[in-house]
Amino acid sequence: MSNQHTLLMFNLLPVGLNISTWWNFGSMLLTCTALQTTTGFFLAIHYTANINLAFTSIVHITRDVPYGWIMQNIHATGASMFFICIYIHIARGLYYGSYLNKEVWVSGTTLLVTLMATAFFGYVLPWGQMSFWAATVITNLLTAVPYLGSTLTTWLWGGFSINDPTLTRFFALHFILPFIIISTSLIHVMLLHNEGSSNPLGTNSDIDKIPFHPYHTYKDTLMLTTLLTLLFITTSFFPNIFNDPENFSKANPLITPQHIKPEWYFLFAYGILRSIPNKLGGTMALVMSIIILLTAPFTHTSHVRSMTFRPMAQVLFWTFIATFMLITWAATKPVEPPFTTIGLSTSILYFSFFIINPLLGWSENKIMNTHN
């Protein structure tokens, strides 16, 4: 009987009539989480968290374990798909003013930070050249913290350099964090259903709602099928498209790669870090590049929630998206002109969005009041 009530609640869940495809990325992210947790579990069964055996254990998984290559490729490519979905999900939130639902936005930003930490720890696990050196560069940023820096770094490493204890604890963290992501996701969804989704018009949806099933279930299924098709095509035909060639060599502390860079989904933050010549300043800018999202609900000044009817805000938004892509591209290049200049100017533009947007909202209100 209780099952019937659960089904009824799910079937009759009222959802806004006019939410577009951009609202499908939440369910896609949930699918990515399930996929990553499942494949990650099977990889963890065969993985060995030891600096002498980690690289070999990955080779063993891809060569000797039945269907190990599928597990490994789906897990690696799935991470990229996860980030593509989450960046679109955040962009949707910024464009349509979803951030005005403060609790949902704050829990979402927490999820993003946790996801980035999980992905970073996971990138270190294969113990390839880029894994080792990316870990060295990023963990070294802790030394920029005044007074406590060196102590924190030594504590995180479990010694005076990145070594076996570091890999062991990174594996432990990479294993536990997805469960924190799952529980935070449940809180995120619960908070969302307190108020309900926004919609492309930015208006209240209460006057016109439809049942979640069958309308939105089929809509979600279509996008999930598209996501999985893209994932399987990439995994089958271009399995190493997101991998760094350096990572196919075992970690060697004596040889530094010519150009150390993290995975593509961290490049925007890495580009901002790299564009500031001061270590502490760069570290603060790196943290702020993500934490600044938290300011969005508190700096919204426009009387209109969504950017659908705000042409100037749309120009600003798409400039921000282009800036994001440009930082990502510039961060893949060596530290030399003109890339240093591009990195610096795009970093300034990136942060400018969060300053100009409230000013633009304020000026729009002035114009509307004048015409009234």
From Swiss-Prot:
Component of the ubiquinol-cytochrome c reductase complex (complex III or cytochrome b-c1 complex) that is part of the mitochondrial respiratory chain. The b-c1 complex mediates electron transfer from ubiquinol to cytochrome c. Contributes to the generation of a proton gradient across the mitochondrial membrane that is then used for ATP synthesis. The chain crosses the membrane at residues 25-45, 69-90, 105-125, 170-190, 218-238, 280-300, 312-332, 339-358. It comes from Heterodon simus. Its cofactor is heme b. Belongs to the cytochrome b family. It is a multi-pass membrane protein. Heme 1 (or BL or b562) is low-potential and absorbs at about 562 nm, and heme 2 (or BH or b566) is high-potential and absorbs at about 566 nm. Disulfide bonds: none annotated. Heme b b566 binds at residues 89, 188. Heme b b562 binds at residues 75, 174. CDD domains: cytochrome_b_C, Cytochrome_b_N. One of its GO terms (cellular component) is respiratory chain complex III. GO terms for biological process: mitochondrial electron transport, ubiquinol to cytochrome c. The cytochrome bc1 complex contains 3 respiratory subunits (MT-CYB, CYC1 and UQCRFS1), 2 core proteins (UQCRC1 and UQCRC2) and probably 6 low-molecular weight proteins. Binds 2 heme b groups non-covalently. Keywords: Electron transport, Heme, Iron, Membrane, Metal-binding, Mitochondrion, Mitochondrion inner membrane, Respiratory chain, Transmembrane, Transmembrane helix, Transport, Ubiquinone. InterPro entries: Cyt_b/b6_C, Cyt_b/b6_C_sf, Cyt_b/b6_N, Cytb/b6-like_sf, Cytochrome_b, Cytochrome_b_C_euk/bac, Cytochrome_b_N_euk/bac, Di-haem_cyt_TM. This is Cytochrome b. The gene is MT-CYB. GO terms for molecular function: metal ion binding; ubiquinol-cytochrome-c reductase activity. It is found in: Mitochondrion inner membrane. A ubiquinone binds at residue 193.
